[in-house]
């Protein structure tokens, strides 16, 4: 593993302490985010995700998000060939939690906006106002071709035009309960949704291209971005700066939430050994599929999420930022993340979710300056 850059010395301001949110990216697909024969092999189930999110809630995580994936990468591990559906999963999780914010992902090519508006209002009712929607345009062509709904490769260059109309319909229906929107992609004729959500519905996105960030700057409450590298916790700073600049153009406050995988153990060496073991078992067949799909979009620029996912540097965990080290080392690196202007939170995955969240809550989070404001844990069993 390449040695990390020298760590920075910094002091968190009070407002930075308060802004650092923590979320869990729940494993809605088999094997989570490690494309390796050496990683834990498991199927996605409601019971597993319930245990994960309830444990996250116990440890004061702020939110839980599930993706949507309609076709996997295959290979020896059948990576992401087995997936639950996001809205129905999160509706179930909303019913068995009480404080944590819940986000489902809408694959917008598969669901009309009026249906998403009504489903979201329903989960708002289930959750008591704790629900929000992550909107994705879709990048993996075979997911949609298999159902006969891929609109053609011109969609790659028009997908944010499509999403702009989509979110305008959502805002109409969540706001007034009625939409007469007329556009190139959607035509509403006295379309109605009632009841409306009990609180303003949060919309989140994960744009890293210029078009994606421009969309988030106009319409999203916050924007996800990839962390970068291994033990380089501030390497994403230029991406956060781009998002901050885009938001300044619209006069809105749209922060960045950064995706990281945590691989922690008692010592740096023990954690590094796990990481090297996972890399040694990389599922090359599944990774080849990912690389092939990343080359299909030739129209969206070089900074798309899928191109980062397929980069060979650390493809075994789709090139999300990776924090490998002792519990103290990971805590220190997460505090460094919090020091980056525009970084309002992190979205975490783990090599082993149940033990990973418990170790995070018991042994990492208490060492983090940017989480020092949290109340004491209750004695209830997580």
Curated annotation (Swiss-Prot):
Induction: Up-regulated by the nitrogen regulatory protein C (NtrC also called GlnG) and repressed by RutR. It catalyses: uracil + FMNH2 + NADH + O2 = (Z)-3-ureidoacrylate + FMN + NAD(+) + H2O + H(+); thymine + FMNH2 + NADH + O2 = (Z)-2-methylureidoacrylate + FMN + NAD(+) + H2O + H(+). SUPFAM superfamilies: Bacterial luciferase-like. Keywords: Flavoprotein, FMN, Monooxygenase, NADP, Oxidoreductase. InterPro entries: Luciferase-like_dom, Luciferase-like_sf, Pyrimidine_monooxygenase_RutA, SsuD_RutA_monooxygenase. GO terms for biological process: alkanesulfonate catabolic process; nitrogen utilization; uracil catabolic process. Belongs to the NtaA/SnaA/DszA monooxygenase family. RutA subfamily. PANTHER family: ALKANESULFONATE MONOOXYGENASE (PTHR42847), ALKANESULFONATE MONOOXYGENASE-RELATED (PTHR42847:SF4). The FMN-N(5)-oxide reacts spontaneously with NADH to produce FMN. Requires the flavin reductase RutF to regenerate FMN in vivo. NCBIfam families: RutA. This is Pyrimidine monooxygenase RutA. The gene is rutA.
